[in-house]
Amino acid sequence: MTAEASEKFSGRRIDFHAHAILPSYVDALKKLKIDATAEEGFPLPKWSVENHLQFMDDAGIDFTILSMATPHISDKIAAREINEEFAELCRRFPKKFGFVATLPLPNVEGSIEEFKFATEKLGALGVKVASNSDGVYLGDERLDPIFAALNEKNSLVIIHPSPARLLPRENVVTGKVMALFEYPTDTTRAVLNMLANRTLEKFPRLKIVVPHCGSFLPYMKQRAGSMFQMLASMNLMEPVNFSAGFKKLFFDTAGDPMPEQFDMLLKVASLDKIIFGTDYPYVPAKVVLGRKKLFDEEILRRGWTEKIYVENARALLEG
């Protein structure tokens, strides 16, 4: 990224995890007969650019990286329309918004084409990928060609959870509202699959961001690392440099984080790998703003303000 382009990323905070509910996305859901409430367990939140800008001002956010909402859409035509609308929004507010492109995964050829178009023609800063797309998880070797294309361009890759295909939805609360349990579960499943299948070793130039304070990865790191080693010794899986792969990951703070989550995350990730995120509008403005004082005080007390709010994000965007 050029010095001129990087100027727009200076400021009090960079929000690395936020969404826009665009008309093209809502139209795509209707055309594809996808019921967001049925799939996610809650309706799409209301969104407008005016409300988002007001939220940013209230929260002290100078620049936001937008991505498509959930449910994930794998339709190639819809992905193009959504990316074009994101690009238009960012052209209207170039010092406020950037975006990461939607890819029609698991369509590999279509995703490579859309990645190139979105980054070369529309100005996308990278891509958003679902933890699984129609049951094909990140780390699946069938997705290697798209990761090779992303790796070639040192691409930013922001992971977002998607519901697993088979869930215990009846009489089990965790299967009804995805954000409660299934989102962090599926993110964790996807990243462990990437580590097990050496995605980060094969494609070392990828800049991968794991959402929601790492989901369950801080808890799982030691267990998974030990299990991978044991399984390899039993010839049940190929040897994997688990620690080296894990160290490559970045983590955002989206999802109403608390000090306890920071403590756990810092046991497995270095401070320069943590970036600020809000998950707006899925986390409503009043919730983010209600936590703002506590969040700011905790970050300030630990001397992390510039690192987490600005410096780490700028380094990731400009690297």
Question: In which residue ranges do the predicted regions lie?
Answer:
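Hydrophobic faces of well-ordered beta-strands that scaffold small-molecule active sites
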Residues: 14-18, 64-66, 98-102, 127-129, ...
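Mid-to-C-terminal alpha-helical segments outside catalytic/metal-binding sites
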Residues: 1-16, 20-63, 84, 113-117, ...
